[in-house]
């Protein structure tokens, strides 16, 4: 008996109009995204209110298109445009319309307010469904590649060397021009073009050095409160007849480091360690605050290569929807400084905020011996003269501190893993700190909706 196969006929046209809803399962995430986006107030979208020009695509459709494509790993505007033709769920979402890549890109860069509103709306929806667990929040940062090559950068020292070389070359070209004019015969070089090229290059290098110098001053100003606090504490110890321990704190310097970098393609990005410090990439430091249910409750982007100054601004970025419920913030040793902890735990007037920081004061060994895994007694009481660092280390050794701090790695780090490995987001599509920040918000909204969809399905099945 001959093998039998299903007859495939790709040439016969459909005689009746097709219903796109029949092509997308009822439990598909695209339905959930459309329902969620419809709850965002329309006043947050940037649209042409005059009604002139061509008809606009509905802003809720455009936002749902971006979110669905980010959830499914398509971030470039051309890839998203292609999905409107090839992806059945996207065709359903767009009702068989096909926004071009220019419209998609323009909508993405013009709607920061809508992305911020979507972030709040999704958290409110999660709270309404009682899926958030906000009392304890973990804060961390991850490096996301910039849309720029590290080879398009120059260091502060190298820029100075190149400026000196350009000065010599300009002088040489001017001398050749004078000789050619005196001899009344043209030079072999196109001297005006060469002078213009070097003048433009000089201006770019001077701007690079000016930006690096401004960054150094800004960093020194940010480090000054921590330095002043350390100096005041050491002086208080001297006044009490005690010898301060440890080396003298180094005063913040406004002089740029010779290796400080400026990138010509994306000037606000920086060279940062990546891959567990194994290599360097042109990147941004994407920060997130994550609750115990693995929802991102606060997000921002930093241009700093490390997290030393990032705890206060990232804690301040926690959405007002959940901020009043936060009682504890967990961070690793990279975030710890006395000034950073004080900024989170105390208001400017000295009153307490009600938030307690649990921070490692040094890198912790994740391998535990059998003895360390067994229940441990409470640590002995601190000495009255204990430093802030000793107090924080003691806080983490208490039963409460241990129980809370072990949640850090299993909340915020898996979120970054899902964003990078499952969603595939490892590189920003936009350039400049402002645009990168709005794209990170869009990524976090997309992640939160994906997380909410998963938890909602699990709750339904239970």
Features from the language model and the residues they span:
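Anion-binding and metal-coordination hotspots
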Residues: 1-3, 7, 66, 73-86, ...
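Hydrophobic alpha-helical membrane-insertion signals
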Residues: 1-31
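Residue-level signal for pocket-adjacent positions within structured domains
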Residues: 10-11, 15, 19, 35, ...
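Basic, short loop/linker segments at the boundary and entry of helix-turn-helix/winged-helix-like folds
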Residues: 24-67, 72
């Amino acid at each position: 008996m001959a093998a039998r196969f299903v007859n495939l006929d790709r040439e016969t046209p459909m005689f009746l109009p097709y219903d796109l809803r029949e092509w997308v399962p009822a439990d598909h995430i695209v339905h959930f995204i459309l329902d969620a986006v419809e709850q965002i107030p329309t006043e947050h979208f940037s649209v042409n209110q005059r009604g002139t020009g061509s008809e606009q695509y509905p802003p809720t459709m455009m936002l749902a298109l971006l979110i669905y494509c980010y959830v499914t790993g398509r971030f470039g505007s051309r890839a998203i445009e292609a999905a409107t033709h090839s992806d059945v769920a996207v065709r359903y979402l767009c009702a068989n319309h096909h926004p071009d890549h220019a419209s998609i890109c323009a909508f993405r860069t013009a709607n920061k307010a809508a992305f911020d509103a979507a972030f709040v709306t999704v958290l409110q929806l999660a709270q309404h469904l009682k899926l958030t667990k906000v009392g304890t929040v973990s804060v961390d940062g991850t490096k996301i590649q910039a849309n720029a090559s590290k080879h398009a950068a120059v260091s502060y020292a190298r820029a100075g060397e190149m400026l000196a070389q350009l000065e010599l070359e300009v002088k040489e070209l001017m001398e050749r021009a004078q000789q050619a004019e005196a001899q009344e015969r043209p030079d072999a070089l196109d001297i005006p073009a060469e002078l213009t090229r070097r003048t433009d290059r000089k201006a770019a290098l001077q701007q690079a050095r000016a930006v690096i110098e401004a960054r150094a001053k800004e960093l020194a100003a940010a480090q000054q409160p921590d330095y002043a606090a350390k100096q005041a504490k050491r002086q208080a110890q001297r006044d009490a007849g005690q010898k301060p321990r440890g080396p003298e704190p180094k005063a913040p310097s406004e002089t740029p480091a010779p290796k400080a970098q400026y990138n010509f393609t994306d000037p606000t990005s920086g060279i940062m360690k990546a891959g567990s410090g194994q290599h360097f990439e042109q990147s941004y430091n994407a920060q997130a605050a994550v609750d115990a249910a693995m929802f991102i409750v606060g997000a921002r982007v930093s241009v700093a290569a490390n997290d030393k100054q990032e705890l206060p601004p990232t804690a301040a970025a926690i959405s007002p929807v959940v901020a009043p419920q936060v009682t504890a913030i967990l961070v690793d040793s990279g975030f710890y400084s006395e000034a950073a902890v004080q900024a989170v735990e105390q208001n400017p007037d000295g009153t307490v905020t009600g938030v307690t920081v649990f921070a490692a004061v040094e890198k912790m060994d994740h391998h535990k011996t059998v003895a360390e895994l067994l229940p441990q007694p409470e640590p002995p009481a601190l000495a009255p003269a204990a430093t802030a660092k000793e107090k924080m280390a003691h806080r983490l050794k208490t039963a409460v501190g241990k129980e809370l701090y072990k949640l850090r790695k299993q909340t915020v780090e898996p979120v970054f893993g899902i964003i990078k490995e499952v969603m595939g987001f490892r590189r920003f599509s936009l350039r400049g700190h402002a645009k990168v920040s709005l794209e990170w918000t869009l990524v976090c909204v997309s992640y939160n909706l994906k997380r909410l969809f998963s938890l909602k399905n699990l709750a339904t099945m239970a």
